[in-house]
Amino acid sequence: MDQLAIERSTTKKVTLRLIPFLFLCFTISILDRVNIGFAALKMNHDLGFSNAIFGLGAGIFFLGYFLLEVPGSAMMVKVGPRKWISRIMVTWAILAVLVAFVKTPMEFYIARFFLGVAEASFYPCMVAYLSGFYQTKHHAKAIAGFMVAIPGANALGAPLSTFLLSVNWLSLAGWQWLFILEAIPSFILGIVCFFYLDDQIKDIKWLNKDEKKWLIDVTTKEELEKQQVKHYTFLQALKDRDVLILSAGYFCWMVGYYGINMFLPTISKGLSEKTSISTQSMGWILGLMYICAMVTMILVGNHSDKKNERRLHVAVCLAISAIAMIISSYIANTSIILSFVFLTIALCGTFGAYAPFWAIPPSFLTGAAAGGAIALINSIGNLGGFFGPYIVGYIKDTTGSFNMSMIFLGVSLIIGSCIVVFLVKQSGKVQSNNFETKLKKSS
């Protein structure tokens, strides 16, 4: 069998083995993360929470996430992906159920904080793990393959969550059942994960001898090529210029991303009330919006791989999202339909940037360094998940509308776009030139 045939068969088997399962795990994690936005439609009224209280509680999840993100990534390297990812899923499932029984703002804050602690490092561990089984040229497409779970989970979660809000079983409100029922799959998949995943390529039993040898050879060769340019240790990666700049860009992006996502059900409910659309119908509309975002994510990821370019793909997506978000704030009172259209475009932009963005760190880092860098970028970036929802809620309580909140989120996305396009050097075709320059200087 020639090398090209082996490459194709191996890549296909890896994709069929890993992508569907990781997609499912990530879908459940996103459901558990975003269901708070839908729960707010009834929970805030039942518990007497203001928008600011809800925004703080929704965002404080990311403080816990931030504190354990980098240490969690280091633990994965020490104990292995199989055990660590399994532990994450089981513990966050248990804590997600506890959120259903909060009564006061303080209980809400504490439960959300420790939920963030439990889930910390899940995403960077997934990215680092998946990247280790693919050639660099396939990273964006592979990452997009499981990252479509983000809009996919929202598309599924919107109608499912709005349905669960209408139930009242065993004297528990619908929003409580929303947390309980959506945590059960996390617990089950966490156990399955322990038996299904392989820690390293050498542990794989589902590839034949030639395929296994080819995969070990190409991934080892690419890791050595990266190390010849500059060998990064775990700690050195955390101090790298591009890693820190990517963290700053991701922070601005996540301010906009979580600011809109946590409050989108509430914003949409306000718009739908002007047209007498029911809560469940609104759930289906939101589901369609997220399906559009999912398609965009796949298309952008494929185009990024085809052009071997990351930076501009990220920047353009964020800029489009920012413009659409700002426009939607100006037309919300004049055209409900157009407002939903521009909100959809904004979602497509924020989701479309994911695959090319996360293909950048593995393109110049490897092994523990890649895991640590991804964890740092994700943890610092996700602090935006704390500030975004809280500031949106505060502005809404202060001004009485979401218009200024949307403008604030749009500005944050524009700043993130500028940081990525003007400051980040490691990107697609640019990267090889940087590597060649460093090699010449070191020789």
Question: What is each of the regions a protein language model found here?
Answer:
Residues V77-M89, D305-L318:
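Cytoplasmic membrane-interface "Motif A"-like loop-to-helix N-cap segments
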Residues G48, G80, F101-E107, A118, ...:
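Helix-breaking motifs and short loop linkers at transmembrane-helix boundaries and internal kinks
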Residues L67-M106:
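Conserved MFS/SLC helix-loop-helix module at the cytosolic interface between two early adjacent transmembrane helices
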Residues I36-G37, L235-I298, Y354, W358, ...:
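Extracytoplasmic gate region of multi-pass secondary transporters
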Residues R310-I360:
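C-terminal transmembrane helical hairpin of 12-TM major facilitator-type secondary transporters
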Residues R17-N51, G157-S161, I260-P265, G388:
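Extracytoplasmic
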Residues A111-V148:
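Cytoplasmic helix-loop-helix junction between adjacent transmembrane helices
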Residues K141-T162, P185-S186, N378-G388:
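Glycine-rich segments within core transmembrane alpha-helices of 12-TM secondary carriers
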